Design a protein with these regions (language model features):
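Basic, polyanion-binding surface patches
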Residues: 1-166
Length: 166
């Protein structure tokens, strides 16, 4: 039996994930991309990973800048996720129309207003893995807010439902 990329993608779609936007500063401008291949790696030291397609515009910027934010989206931020998932932005003020507004950390890293949580990260290592790169970063600061997460499952955005039966 030969496994197709479509079958693999369908199987991976059965794993529900949260949705993040990776943000970084490029000469005073916010650059970002939607990512759901994100995970905690270690508590001591506090490490996370994010996987980025090597053809994505953000890929080379992460290598060069070394400092970035991971914004964990709330259920009300689907439009923002869709905007940052596009490979090409519509026009200069489209991010504001999508509802994306940013503050800055003391180090200048963009923080998405209203995100459920935010992690400020410094790149520790990068490992090529197929057509993606696994970026491992040390978490230097976090902000956590109340709310429900935006989820992604079987190719669609979702919200939390009821608790699973015991």
């Amino acid at each position: 039996m030969s496994l197709s990329p479509t079958q693999f993608r369908k199987a991976m779609g059965c794993f529900a994930t949260g949705v993040t936007i990776i943000t970084l500063d490029l000469d005073g401008e916010v650059h970002g991309m939607t990512a759901n291949a994100f995970a905690s790696v270690s508590l001591d030291p506090m490490l996370v990973l994010v996987c980025v397609d090597q053809s994505a515009r953000t890929h080379d910027h992460l290598h060069a800048k070394k400092r970035f934010g991971i914004n964990i989206l709330g259920e009300h931020q689907r439009v923002i996720s869709e905007y940052y998932a596009r490979p090409v932005r519509a026009h200069e003020h489209a991010e504001e129309e999508a509802g994306a507004r940013f503050d800055r950390t003391a180090q200048g890293t963009p923080i998405l207003n209203g995100a459920l949580a935010y992690l400020e990260c410094r790149l520790k290592s990068a490992e090529d893995a197929g057509d993606h790169t696994i970026f491992i970063a040390e978490v230097e600061d976090v902000v956590v807010r109340e709310g429900e997460p935006l989820l992604f499952f079987q190719g669609k955005y979702r919200q939390l439902g009821e608790d699973a039966p015991e």
